[in-house]
Amino acid sequence: MVSVKKVKKSQENIGSKLALVMKSGKSQLGYKSTLKTLRAGKSKLILLASNLPSIRRSEIEYYAMLSKTTVHLYSGNNVDLGTALGRHYRVSVMSITDAGDSDILTALNAKA
């Protein structure tokens, strides 16, 4: 069993890496634009909020499997993911196309 402190620390660590991606990298926020990047084969990592509806989640995972892209389930809900990205709105799906200065791709074992 993982302690609450360790989970919170790893969530803060991912949050700081996400903030660096938003500042120095390239990403797409939202369901439709994420599907576009997956179909084009540009995505390197997909982040999904924990409260994403299952039909959308399965569709994104299907396209990610076809394009051999890593999918990471964010431990917080869409409000938490939006806050971690520095946005004042909810974000359920995020596609990272270029990580910039962040090492989030290696930390979450995505393709570089």
UniProtKB/Swiss-Prot annotation:
Query: What's any one GO cellular component for it?
Result: cytosolic large ribosomal subunit
- Give the family per the record: Belongs to the eukaryotic ribosomal protein eL30 family.
Record-linked InterPro entries: Ribosomal_eL30-like, Ribosomal_eL30-like_sf, Ribosomal_eL30_CS, Ribosomal_eL8/eL30/eS12/Gad45
What phylogenetic lineage does the species belong to?
Answer: Eukaryota, Amoebozoa, Evosea, Eumycetozoa, Dictyostelia
Check the record and name the PROSITE patterns matching this protein.
Answer: RIBOSOMAL_L30E_1, RIBOSOMAL_L30E_2
Its protein name is Large ribosomal subunit protein eL30
Q: Does the keyword Ribonucleoprotein apply?
A: yes
Q: One Pfam match, by short name?
A: Ribosomal_L7Ae
Q: Which GO terms describe its molecular function?
A: RNA binding; structural constituent of ribosome
Query: What UniProt keywords apply to this chain's record, in alphabetical order?
Result: Ribonucleoprotein, Ribosomal protein
